[in-house]
A protein has these predicted regions:
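Active-site microenvironment of metallo-dependent hydrolases
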Residues: 2-100
Length: 100
């Protein structure tokens, strides 16, 4: 699952090994998923950006984000965004590693 959702995309977009792996020197970006939870999608529920509509407004989906870590720092916990302005970081892409 990690290979499919994290490692392969990081290699495809030239971001591996900074992204896509948990190892010394790599970013510790981790999402803890609760497959038994439920999530209601809506602009006032789960979107942490400036938007006024969603095509999925009101839909309920299986699964729920429990915790999100960005570079080892908790940025989502207990359904609350706890990140800080300026925490984001530009990652320069390299070549797709599958083209070698």
């Amino acid at each position: 699952w990690v290979e499919t959702c994290s490692t392969s995309p990081a290699r495809m977009f030239g971001m591996y090994p900074k992204k896509g792996i948990i190892a010394p020197g790599s970013d510790a970006d981790i999402l803890v998923w609760d497959p038994n939870g439920k999530t209601k999608i809506g602009i006032n529920d789960k979107h942490h950006m400036n938007m006024d509509h969603s095509s999925w407004e009101g839909f309920k989906v299986d699964g729920k984000v429990d915790t999100v870590l960005s570079r080892g720092k908790i940025v989502v916990e207990n359904d609350k965004f706890t990140g800080t302005k300026g925490h984001g970081k530009f990652i320069r892409r390299g070549l797709c590693q599958y083209l070698n």
